[in-house]
Amino acid sequence: MSKIIRSSDESRGALENGVNSLADAVKVTIGPKGRNVVLEKKFGAPDIVNDGVTIARDIELENPFENLGAKLIEQVASKTKDKAGDGTTTATVLAQVMVHEGLKNTAAGASPIEIRRGMEKAVSHIVDKLQQQSKKISGDKVLQVATVSSGGDEEIGAMVAEAMDKVSVDGVITVEESKSLNTELEITEGMAFDRGYSSPYFVTDAERQICEFENPLLLITDRKISSIADLVPVLETVQKSSSPLVILAEEVDGEALATLVVNKNRGVLQVASVRAPSFGERRKAALADIAVLTKGTLISEDKAMTLDKVSLADLGKARKITITKESTTIVANDDTKKEVASRVASIKRELDQTDSDYDKEKLNERIAKLAGGVAVIKVGAPTETELKNRKLRIEDALNATRAAVEEGIVAGGGSTLIKLGEELDSLSKSLDGDQATGVDIIKKALSAPAKQIALNAGENGDVVVSEIQRLGKGFNAATGQYEDLISAGIIDAVKVIRLALQDAVSIASLLITTEVIIADKPEPPSPAGGEGGGDPMGGMGGMGGMGGMGMPGMGGMGMPGMM
């Protein structure tokens, strides 16, 4: 494919246009009086959201150079979301100002490299000060963080705080759609562990990059699976049951993984594979725990069990499984409490008999995972659009509250950033030339979130920032009053602010130091009736039955590379 090349001011101008297009759409959502954004969908009703990263991921600009700028800023939101779970709009607002001021100064002849160094020094200084001001939280403060992070929804805040109280802050909390109009909290059996899907092709929700199955079956084994022949009998059985299948094994790779991916993407099977947690003997123990939780059988080499003899009765069952890139959460059915209690008692007896501190630690971890349970927040709403919006708010509140417990809190509403910005004056004076300019850029960016929160509340942003500096108090956009925001319950998680700043300066400094952009030349539209797009799976193979491989036919199961 041919490329288009742009350089110097022309390239940076196109990037900034893309940054502004995305940031202007996202920043209207910040604060308690932030507005909603309507996203058109190819199929079904449009989504109405006020979640920054959801909006950012949906934006695709026609101009390829501007689109590159938009996608770079989307990375700011996505990185902050992945690491902190919240603060995506704050990160976007910060990055927009940093990019604008940085490019304005480089166009006037400043050195982009020196500006970047100054910006990085300023952010490092701010992060140190931020952590010094951090206050640890518990009790009512957890409720306040959850309420603020959900956009001021007290019902959501109370539910998130209650869930954390019941299963602990480190416990497993999942969010799912309710069959009723009410939003409810339920505590059930379940487990989570740090292993994700074997291939991103197993993802069922591309926007959130997760694989989620309702009422799946589980094949649990300590074997490594490389040949599809090992799986054919169980796949045939599962295909007839029409249930999703999750394969939990030492590893699934090679021909077996490729075939599962092909058939999942062709809609023949709802399937995913996950690498088993832990290592060695502890892996077998962890798999046995999961087998008890799901009323399944561990297909183990130690018992001379083989995969070709697996029946439907050997497969575990769960109410729901959610698999991300890095973790798996199993929500068990309601009929496993007796078995789980018996398993926990067995592990406790083992704990009493060991003298090793390391073994005790690992056994206690297993007990915590099995006995801790899972808090399920069931989200209800009158319409599907409101349901999706409410679900996003709850997920934001959960993530932000965890972040607040982890690194503490500071006053919210952008007021802390403004006060920290005032401490950059001494750093700016200690630096020369363009590095000092970089520090000044960060200082200006730090007032942007408070300014935008005020604008969304119908106030003059510059006046509000000036009053915050004069009074030494924060601006409560919900009431229009200047007050002590921590006492008012308007608080931000230090981790969220820290990551928003660090991610924003990371991408902004890259944009400022860009000299050349190379983009794909847009292809002309194909004539009507022409050939359609190719198979998105490329050369992953035909739909030939497995009978041609000398294996039992699977009624349309595809093999990679077969024509």
UniProtKB/Swiss-Prot annotation:
InterPro entries, alphabetized? Chaperonin_Cpn60_CS, Cpn60/GroEL, Cpn60/GroEL/TCP-1, GroEL-like_apical_dom_sf, GROEL-like_equatorial_sf, TCP-1-like_intermed_sf
Q: Where is this region: Disordered?
A: 520-545
Q: Annotated Gene Ontology MF terms?
A: ATP binding; ATP-dependent protein folding chaperone; isomerase activity; unfolded protein binding
Q: What reaction does this catalyse?
A: ATP + H2O + a folded polypeptide = ADP + phosphate + an unfolded polypeptide
Does the record carry ATP-binding as a key word? yes
Indicate where this protein resides in the cell. Cytoplasm
- What are the transmembrane regions? none
The broad enzyme category this protein falls into is isomerase
Q: Does the keyword Nucleus apply?
A: no
Per UniProt, subunit arrangement is: Forms a cylinder of 14 subunits composed of two heptameric rings stacked back-to-back. Interacts with the co-chaperonin GroES.
| Entry protein name | Chaperonin GroEL 1
Q: Which organism is it from?
A: Prochlorococcus marinus (strain SARG / CCMP1375 / SS120)
Q: Which gene encodes it?
A: groEL1
